[in-house]
């Protein structure tokens, strides 16, 4: 085991000099004793002359030149398997929940090759989420990849937590949650939410929050993914939740700048597409088991053409776009039914009735968008009878796309609702065919199934 010495410290970047014949490989882990703490460094570049440039996985406060550094001769390794369930770990797989050692039987390196082309499997099975707008407009595939896109404060994390609650409770498999550069408060809320709903013993939690150095935030997604891969390779169907993939990109940008690389478009790292690919290509289903992943994607300044969200789009099977305009109408979940897409929305996969209902809803909402200008200038009275009907139905559909969430009960005071796909299709089909033209539009706001809307109308 070779030993080197620190020669330079610039923030999270630490340069270490080793003997010329024992230079560590790129991505090898190094260990340095920093006071009472052990600090792990990851080799990023070999600068020549026996010097390697590394990124610190923790705070570099207190490091000084001349400290001894050990080469561990392998990449960062984290615990995998059932021992990780119900535990909160950091990027190195160390427990941070004060419940003692993990007691794992096996450790895996966080840098792994993606499955080969022959190993991949294709699934057409749908995953019901119980959220009307998602099940109807952008259905999820079991073993697929989903992105929740949205700007600041439109409800990415709340939607993610509702999905976890619905899928983890209805689906009895294991889940892995990777908190990448998000708020510690949300991580804490999430842990208690899982504990209260008795699913904590089926979830592994890996956190690298906002206050961590960039090296930590860049690698924590890989730590969570490695744990999910282990469950998948045991032949299970596992859920992987990543909140937030944008912070992974941002950490990459910070590391890239610290390493002295030239920035590319909008200041992102030149290796943006490759870094995203390395992560996303591993999140996949094989013939032994599946990983269904849900990733929250922050959209800077609500601009979907920003390089970071734009690079993420290419890897996903379904995109759920959260819109500020819809949130400002008070409609939650604020999913934009015209902007959200799914590869599964195909009559051969979801069936003709589901497909026709979803496309019908989209065409009515699209027509309503077009008529809005006329209404704003001339008023409703100038519309033809046919268009008035379209507007009335569109407004009902828009309100019926809202739904009370279980995880938001504490804020809204109304109990959460889980709506089956069958009820969702029946409800929207009924509105489109005019069965509920006699009901007031308020009746459709914040209800579960269409039967609840009918009940609510009686009270109005």
UniProtKB/Swiss-Prot annotation:
Assembly and oligomerization: F-type ATPases have 2 components, CF(1) - the catalytic core - and CF(0) - the membrane proton channel. CF(1) has five subunits: alpha(3), beta(3), gamma(1), delta(1), epsilon(1). CF(0) has three main subunits: a(1), b(2) and c(9-12). The alpha and beta chains form an alternating ring which encloses part of the gamma chain. CF(1) is attached to CF(0) by a central stalk formed by the gamma and epsilon chains, while a peripheral stalk is formed by the delta and b chains.
Topology in membrane: Peripheral membrane protein
Residues binding ATP, per UniProt: 150-157
Annotated keywords: ATP synthesis, ATP-binding, Cell inner membrane, Cell membrane, CF(1), Hydrogen ion transport, Ion transport, Membrane, Nucleotide-binding, Translocase, Transport
GO cellular component, one term: proton-transporting ATP synthase complex
Database matches in HAMAP family: ATP_synth_beta_bact
GO molecular function: ATP binding; ATP hydrolysis activity; proton-transporting ATP synthase activity, rotational mechanism
Documented EC number(s): 7.1.2.2
NCBIfam families given in the database record: atpD
Organism the protein comes from: Salmonella gallinarum (strain 287/91 / NCTC 13346)
Predominant localisation class: membrane
Oxidoreductase among keywords: no
Compartments (UniProt record): Cell inner membrane
PROSITE patterns: ATPASE_ALPHA_BETA
Physiological role: Produces ATP from ADP in the presence of a proton gradient across the membrane. The catalytic sites are hosted primarily by the beta subunits.
Membership in a protein family: Belongs to the ATPase alpha/beta chains family.
Protein name: ATP synthase subunit beta
Pfam families noted in UniProt: ATP-synt_ab (PF00006), ATP-synt_ab_N (PF02874), ATP-synt_VA_C (PF22919)
Catalysed reactions, as listed in the record: ATP + H2O + 4 H(+)(in) = ADP + phosphate + 5 H(+)(out)
């Amino acid at each position: 085991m070779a030993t080197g010495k620190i020669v330079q410290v610039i923030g999270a970047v630490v340069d270490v000099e080793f003997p010329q014949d024992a230079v560590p490989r790129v991505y090898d882990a190094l260990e340095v004793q920093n006071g009472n703490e052990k600090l792990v460094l990851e080799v990023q570049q070999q600068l020549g002359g026996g010097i390697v440039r590394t990124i610190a996985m923790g705070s570099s406060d207190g490091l000084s030149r001349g400290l001894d550094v050990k080469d561990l001769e392998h990449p960062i390794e984290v615990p995998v398997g059932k021992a990780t369930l119900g535990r909160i770990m950091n990027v190195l797989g160390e427990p941070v929940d004060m419940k003692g050692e993990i007691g794992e039987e096996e450790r895996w390196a966080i840098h792994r090759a993606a499955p080969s082309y022959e190993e991949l499997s294709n699934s057409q099975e749908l995953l019901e989420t119980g959220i009307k707008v998602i099940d109807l407009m952008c259905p999820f595939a079991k073993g697929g990849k989903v992105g929740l896109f949205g700007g600041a404060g439109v409800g990415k994390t709340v939607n993610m937590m509702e999905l976890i609650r619905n899928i983890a409770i209805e689906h009895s498999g294991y889940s892995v949650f990777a908190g990448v550069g998000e708020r510690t408060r949300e991580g804490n809320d999430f842990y208690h939410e899982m504990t209260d709903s008795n699913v904590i013993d089926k979830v592994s939690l890996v956190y690298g929050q906002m206050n961590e150095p960039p090296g930590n935030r860049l690698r924590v997604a890989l730590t969570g993914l490695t744990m999910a891969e282990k469950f998948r390779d045991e032949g299970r169907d596992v859920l992987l939740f990543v909140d937030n993939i944008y912070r992974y990109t941002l950490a990459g940008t910070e590391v890239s700048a610290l390493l002295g690389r030239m920035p590319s478009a909008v200041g992102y790292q030149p290796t943006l597409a490759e870094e995203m690919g390395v992560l996303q290509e591993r999140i996949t289903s094989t013939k032994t088991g599946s990983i269904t992943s849900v990733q929250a994607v922050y959209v800077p300044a609500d601009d979907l053409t920003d390089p970071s969200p734009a690079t993420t789009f290419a890897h996903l099977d379904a995109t759920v776009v959260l819109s500020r305009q819809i949130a400002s109408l008070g409609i939650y979940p604020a999913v934009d039914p015209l902007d959200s897409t799914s590869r599964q929305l195909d009559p051969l996969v979801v069936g003709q009735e589901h497909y026709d209902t979803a496309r019908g809803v989209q065409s009515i909402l699209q027509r309503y968008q077009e008529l809005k200008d006329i209404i704003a200038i001339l008023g409703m009275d100038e519309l033809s009878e046919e268009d008035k009907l379209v507007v009335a139905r569109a407004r009902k559909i828009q309100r019926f796309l809202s739904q009370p969430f279980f995880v938001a009960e504490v804020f809204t005071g109304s109990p959460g609702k889980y709506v089956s796909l069958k009820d969702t299709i029946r409800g929207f089909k009924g509105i489109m065919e005019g069965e509920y033209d006699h009901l007031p539009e308020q009746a459709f706001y914040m209800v579960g199934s269409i039967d609840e809307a009918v009940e609510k109308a009686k009270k109005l």
